[in-house]
């Protein structure tokens, strides 16, 4: 799927080795987005972006995403104060996923349930175990 905001790659070579940002949005008009802490390398969250979210992220250098559950654009941290300053944006080899290297503001968290990372649980012997304390209570 192509959009008016980004060019379409004209060849496999352009897609994989070209110099234009030409994201391959899925049938729902989305690409997967991984947010990684720019300083520690910790994976903070996985989300989705539509063309508008990607455009705003590129223009403002602040992470914007698309909420599939709310069906709306969302500027990460607008209500929580956990804005994500984008230090670097990468695409994968076929441009259907983006990696945002970010520096979180506020309390440094990214997870809506109060943790620094959305990946706060580890599977140990078939049971999920919380490996970190929440930054704040999510009530």
UniProtKB/Swiss-Prot annotation:
Q: Which GO terms describe its cellular component?
A: cytoplasm
Cofactor comment: Binds 1 Mg(2+) ion per subunit. Binds 1 zinc ion per subunit.
For molecular function, the Gene Ontology terms on record are: magnesium ion binding; phosphoribosyl-AMP cyclohydrolase activity; zinc ion binding
Cofactor(s) the record lists: Mg(2+); Zn(2+)
Question: Which pathway is recorded for this entry?
Answer: Amino-acid biosynthesis; L-histidine biosynthesis; L-histidine from 5-phospho-alpha-D-ribose 1-diphosphate: step 3/9
Q: What class of enzyme is it?
A: hydrolase
Mind telling me which InterPro entries this protein's record contains?
PRA-CH, PRib_AMP_CycHydrolase_dom, PRib_AMP_CycHydrolase_sf
Which E.C. number(s) belong to this protein?
Answer: 3.5.4.19
**Which catalysed reactions does the entry list for this protein?**
1-(5-phospho-beta-D-ribosyl)-5'-AMP + H2O = 1-(5-phospho-beta-D-ribosyl)-5-[(5-phospho-beta-D-ribosylamino)methylideneamino]imidazole-4-carboxamide
Q: How does it assemble?
A: Homodimer.
Q: Which family does it belong to?
A: Belongs to the PRA-CH family.
What the protein does comes down to: Catalyzes the hydrolysis of the adenine ring of phosphoribosyl-AMP.
Q: Which NCBIfam families match?
A: PRK00051.1
Q: What protein am I looking at? A: Phosphoribosyl-AMP cyclohydrolase
Organism, by scientific name, is Caulobacter vibrioides (strain NA1000 / CB15N) (Caulobacter crescentus)
